Amino acid sequence: ANLIRWEELTDIVLVGHSYGGCVISGVADRMSEKIAALVYLDAFVLENGQSLHDALPAEHRQGQLEAAAALGDGWRVPPIPAAVFNVNAADRAWVDDQCTDQPLASFQQKLHLDHSAAAVGSIHYIYAADWEATPFTGFYESAKARGWSTREIACGHDIMLDRPEELTAALLQAAAG
């Protein structure tokens, strides 16, 4: 949010991938007048007062807590292997090498919204439709029910790696309004 203020940015298209959906929701809630569009890219869409852990299935939440306790000194969650996200085989080793632990607190912190994000010009949801363990189906269905612009792309969670051309077209469409 500070970058938007400091650089005096306007007509922004904010894109949030995965956990980044939580971030763009918070930014949009605080400065919707600066944002032309939100794009949730196979992402979490939290409600006011909800944490990421609240939105996850119990088995995912428990797995993160156990991983943090066993491998993350109790405060960080090790990355999930790229294969789980159905990242294309050619990029899996690279993705695994780039990923880092995530603070457990980021999963537990509640998002506080006053719903001014509703003033954003357009909201889009792009769903990666080709990975079995996806926790995003419900968010995609909710986006459709809310009347948001939606699109399915048949690939794993890292759309930007698996289908960059389709993603570029979708983002340009969102930016065009």
What spans do the regions from the language model cover?
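Conserved loop-alpha-helix segment in the C-terminal half of the alpha/beta-hydrolase fold
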Residues: 128-161, 166, 174
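Flexible "cap/lid" loop of the alpha/beta hydrolase fold
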Residues: 29-35, 39-81, 106-107, 111-112, ...
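Active-site nucleophile elbow and catalytic-triad environment of alpha/beta-hydrolase enzymes
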Residues: 97-116, 129-131
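Conserved acidic catalytic loop of the alpha/beta-hydrolase fold
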Residues: 1-12
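Short, hydrophobic alpha-helix immediately C-terminal to the catalytic nucleophile
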Residues: 25-29, 168
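Short beta-strand/loop motif that positions the catalytic acidic residue
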Residues: 119, 125-127
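C-terminal alpha-helix
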Residues: 3, 170-177
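Gly/Ala-rich beta-loop-alpha elbow adjacent to hydrolase catalytic centers
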Residues: 15-16, 20, 24
